[in-house]
């Protein structure tokens, strides 16, 4: 009984790992694919908000305070 239960658990883990990796680019780890998506979304948000040159040189997240834009 325990062997069957362990086999089912391992099978479910394998299915989860395979489905998780299906989103990644071929040969890339899932975390890399998720990081690329996060960077793309961050870039889109940056384009929506004006930002000064001083704040642009700062490390992310780049948020320009009001006094900087005036």
Curated annotation (Swiss-Prot):
GO terms for molecular function: toxin activity. Residues 1-24 form the signal peptide. Expressed by the venom gland. It comes from the Eukaryota. It is found in: Secreted. One of its GO terms (cellular component) is extracellular region. Contains 2 disulfide bonds. Keywords: Disulfide bond, Secreted, Signal, Toxin. This is U-scoloptoxin(04)-Er3a. It comes from Ethmostigmus rubripes. The lineage of its organism: Eukaryota, Metazoa, Ecdysozoa, Arthropoda, Myriapoda.
